[in-house]
Regions:
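Conserved small/polar residues in nucleotide/adenosyl-binding loops
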Residues: 173-174
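N-terminal glycine-rich flavin-associated loop
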Residues: 120-138, 164
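Beta-strand segments within the central parallel beta-sheet cores of soluble alpha/beta enzyme folds
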Residues: 123-124, 142-148
């Protein structure tokens, strides 16, 4: 089946099993890992993220001392996801990731977004690291990817002429 082939390619025929004790041994083991991560994601969303959603909307982020701080519920949500090892899901294990194919990651993202779409957007910023992984050099990989997998940093920065990062001031014209 197609998912079996995807796993073989992503896992490079399961060669990480010699170096990482949590790497799958074969296709069945990989699918079991994905199922467990989906279960863990469901537990976190049901026990932490969904109950925090309304309070996060009411509190909102805060700006002080030149920094934006997330609402306390958002911080709790992020802490729970990081503690469960759910950052850097698609990144290689050598950087602290889970080396998952995009399919189980996307399934987790859907579960998270169903509980709190705003938090789903924040948590899924981890997919931005795919660009650095694909096009960055080894120095960039070693400096940034482990920190993202550990939940220490992540952002998405936008810029447009005459608007900077102010998305509401961006204009789009089609022809």
């Amino acid at each position: 089946p197609m998912m079996e082939r995807i796993c073989e390619l992503k896992e490079r025929n399961y060669r990480d099993k010699e170096e990482f004790d949590y790497a799958p041994q074969d296709y069945a083991d990989a699918m079991d890992s994905y199922d467990k991560i989906l279960e863990i994601t469901g537990e976190i969303t049901g026990e932490t993220i969904a109950p925090n959603a309304e309070g996060v909307d009411e509190e909102g982020p805060h700006c002080g001392n030149g920094r934006v701080e997330y609402a306390s519920g958002t911080k709790q949500n992020l802490d729970a996801m990081v503690k469960a090892g759910l950052n850097g899901m698609t990144m290689p294990r050598r950087f602290g990731g889970l080396n998952f194919p995009i399919t189980p990651y996307t399934m987790c993202a859907e579960i998270v977004a169903a509980a709190d779409a705003g938090f789903g957007n924040i948590w899924s910023l981890q997919d931005c690291i795919e660009t650095l992984y694909e096009f960055g050099n080894e120095d960039q990989h070693s400096r940034f990817i482990p920190r993202i997998c550990a939940g220490e940093t992540m952002s998405m920065d936008l810029t447009e002429p005459d608007a900077g990062s102010d998305l509401q001031s961006c204009l789009l014209y089609t022809s």
